[in-house]
């Protein structure tokens, strides 16, 4: 699949994948209407003010890249009954939510920042709330394919290096930028395939 970021650098499009994401997921189908789900995903996020339609960002000229490694656990709710035991093709829209724990790099605007250069300040471990909308369909009795779009609302505003207070615990106005009242988001868009066993 693909991923994009929504925050204080670059474009603000909700779904506009610009880098790859990969991973694995495990589901436990508890009923035809819900399943427990665990996933591991790895992706790179990046953004560039030069791509923004906002003239203020375009003239500022900042850019960044970061890596996301996440584990997510939660519940997937089927809008319609989805039971592979039925013996005929199954399909349904679904919603997934739960809790995500992820690792990214802590970034900091360089002290000498005429070009908006960023310094890596180590690992940033934090939580996010995943909200995933998808549509799945049985391909065979044991294989299910799905298309989904999933947003992660994070509890950090520093995926892009805009909020150094999260690193040092105090304000650093000369190294801050963007909107301090909103946290960063990242979005995964793609397809997945699950294989059932024990039936």
Residue ranges and their predicted role:
Residues 1-27, 106, 188-199:
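Short glycine/proline- and aromatic-enriched beta-strand/turn motifs that initiate or cap beta-hairpins
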Residues 6-12, 56-64, 115-121, 176-179:
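Extracellular loop and loop/strand-boundary signature of outer-membrane beta-barrel proteins
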Residues 12-16, 52-59, 111-117, 162-171:
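Flexible, surface-exposed loop regions and adjacent strand-edge segments
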Residues 16-20, 67-71, 91, 121-129, ...:
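Residues that define the transmembrane beta-barrel architecture of outer-membrane proteins
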Residues 24-28, 73-77, 97-101, 131-137, ...:
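Residues on the lipid-exposed face of transmembrane beta-strands in outer-membrane beta-barrel proteins
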Residues 29-33, 90-92, 140-142:
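Strand-connecting loop/turn motifs
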Residues 34-111, 195-197:
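Gram-negative (and chloroplast) outer-membrane scaffold detector with strong preference
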Residues 138-199:
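Predominantly the C-terminal beta-signal and adjacent terminal strand-loop region
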């Amino acid at each position: 699949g693909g991923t994009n970021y929504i925050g204080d650098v670059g474009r603000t499009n909700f779904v506009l994948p610009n880098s790859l994401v990969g991973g694995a997921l495990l589901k436990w189908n508890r009923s035809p209407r819900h399943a427990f789900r665990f996933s591991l995903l790895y992706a790179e996020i990046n953004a560039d003010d030069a791509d923004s339609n906002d003239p203020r960002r375009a003239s500022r000229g900042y850019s960044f890249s970061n890596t996301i490694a996440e584990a997510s656990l939660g519940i997937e709710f089927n809008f319609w009954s989805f039971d592979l035991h039925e013996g005929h093709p199954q399909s349904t829209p679904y919603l997934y939510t739960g809790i995500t724990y992820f690792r990214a790099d802590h970034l900091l605007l360089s002290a000498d920042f005429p070009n908006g250069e960023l310094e890596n300040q180590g690992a940033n471990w934090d939580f996010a709330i995943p909200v995933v909308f998808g549509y799945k369909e049985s391909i065979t009795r044991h294989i299910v394919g799905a298309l989904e779009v999933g947003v992660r609302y994070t509890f950090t505003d520093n995926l892009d290096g805009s909020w150094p207070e999260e690193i040092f615990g105090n304000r650093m106005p000369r190294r801050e930028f963007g909107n301090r009242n909103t946290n960063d988001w990242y979005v995964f868009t793609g397809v997945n395939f699950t294989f059932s066993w024990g039936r």
